[in-house]
Amino acid sequence: MPLLFLERFPWPSLRTYTGLSGLALLGTIVSAYRALSQPEDGSGEPEPLTAPLQPEALAPARLTAGGPRARDVAQYLLSDSLFVWVLVNTACCVLMLVAKLIQCIVFGPLRVSERQHLKDKFWNFIFYKFIFIFGVLNVQTVEEVVMWCLWFAGLVFLHLMVQLCKDRFEYLSFSPTTPMSSHGRVLSLLIAMLLSCCGLAVVCCVTGYTHGMHTLAFMAAESLLVTVRTAHVILRYVIHLWDLNHEGTWEGKGTYVYYTDFVMELALLSLDLMHHIHMLLFGNIWLSMASLVIFMQLRYLFHEVQRRIRRHKNYLRVVGNMEARFAVATPEELAVNNDDCAICWDSMQAARKLPCGHLFHNSCLRSWLEQDTSCPTCRMSLNIADGSRAREDHQGENLDENLVPVAAAEGRPRLNQHNHFFHFDGSRIASWLPSFSVEVMHTTNILGITQASNSQLNAMAHQIQEMFPQVPYHLVLQDLQMTRSVEITTDNILEGRIQVPFPTQRSDSLRPALNSPVERPSPDLEEGEASVQTERVPLDLSPRLEETLDFSEVELEPIEVEDFEARGSRFSKSADERQRMLVQRKDDLLQQARKRFLNKSSEDDGASERLLPSEGTSSDPVTLRRRMLAAAAERRLQRQRTT
């Protein structure tokens, strides 16, 4: 809203403002009375506006025995350049008191939205009329400024009252328990406003006859604007009251409401557009700040007219398609369904049937199809869009492709385009401010994709594995290296693009000692062969023994997960990541050294066992199991000590 700082200014209350205005008026009257009561010396003459009053005209009034009359005092106040603004302020104060009285009688306490609308309307009106007076008309005398200020004071009073009536009508029309007395008070005020607009037309004719055709055109346009707004609200109120008193459901209400809004809004926009064009041509202000403001307002009005015409064309298209494609439901179908309209929840005496079999009111379905081309109940597509709508849908699909992954031919998700759309709506601040949009497109592909840090990939992989623990870590990480997005990888898992192995595959790979046969060396010392022949002996362990060996699975699992984690590049930009990689390499080297040591010690133990003379014990399966368990326990203790 323009002049936003005025809202934050600590304005006085209406009571304080009224008291100050009364004191100012009383002071000016007393001053004028004293000036007229003094003997004629020329020092007390007021500063004239245009043509100063002759002293001979005021002398008879001063010489009367009863002193100056009220007419003489008023004439003196109007002729003074300072006292006249006190009279203008008094007129504004009277209008505010009348508005407050109307609020108490007709509306009562105002809602928050009504107060905000009144503030917006008032400050916008003040801003534009200030530009009109000093930028378009370029008035030179105080008399003209006073005349236009009084004229616009009456106009802003009518505009605010009409706006308040419109907001209250919209509130009362949606309230099911509104008494008729409330409707009667608001409608009576609207009729009084319409009669006041007729009085403004008479003032336009009288003033325009004396000041020229341009002044008449400006004043007539302003009065017509407020008259059209008042008539619009009255017509809407009449339609609503007729619907309330009408028995049953009035199917034609939507059509009457739509065409009333269309005609009145188009007439209002056309009048306002012509009024601003007249201001631009009359003022000859091609290179000024006022011309910029008028150009912005003209652009806004022109786009509003275009938008309203496009909406009307869409309405006609929807009505034509609805009447051509969807037949009226028969009484038998209404009796069989015996249901209420799913949009307005009212009983249906007449309805239209969609291809999916659902029934709706004619007006309800028309209002729905203006926004969406699907069934309100089952969301089945009705396919009634024409070529332009189809193109808009196609553009919307293309926009969705930038946000949603689409499967490529090889089954991998296609990389998306990250579009950033910024929109500035100037009409929310002021109707004359422009609205603009900026769209920044970042097209990503495999070659030019920005390499995300490995720590981010690992964090995303852990996040996905918390949601899908059955998916191996390395598969999640491989997909993240391609997509760089948690959402896309999640969609790939849900849609089956990532082949998840069976749960038994991991357990089999982690526990090879439990399922694979044991190779037992059987050296032949008598023949002196250097080769070692192996003999496969199936290893059948008891349940307790399997529980004892479960620690190997628990310890191998994090090691296997760590092997699949993405290690950062040796030339990483992050110092923390380089330090983490160094520590990780050091731990890997220590683990490899421990493994080599344990393998070497186990080989030495096996060689010493082969050299034992006791042949019976070496071939005993029970002894072999005991030795294996002892070796496994020893390795476990060594690992615990080293870690």
UniProtKB/Swiss-Prot annotation:
Transmembrane segments: 82-102, 122-142, 186-206, 215-235, 254-274, 276-296, 429-449
Gene Ontology BP term (one): protein autoubiquitination
Description of post-translational modifications: Palmitoylation of the RING-type zing finger by ZDHHC6 promotes localization to the peripheral endoplasmic reticulum.
Membrane topology: Multi-pass membrane protein
ZnF (RING-type) ranges: 341-379
Organs and tissues of expression: Expressed in heart, brain, liver, lung, skeletal muscle, kidney and testis. Not detected in spleen.
Keywords: Endoplasmic reticulum, Lipoprotein, Membrane, Metal-binding, Nucleotide-binding, Palmitate, Phosphoprotein, Receptor, Transferase, Transmembrane, Transmembrane helix, Ubl conjugation pathway, Wnt signaling pathway, Zinc, Zinc-finger
SUPFAM superfamilies with a match to the protein in the record: RING/U-box
PANTHER family registered for this protein in UniProt: E3 UBIQUITIN-PROTEIN LIGASE AMFR, E3 UBIQUITIN-PROTEIN LIGASE RNF8
Name listed for the protein in its UniProt record: E3 ubiquitin-protein ligase AMFR
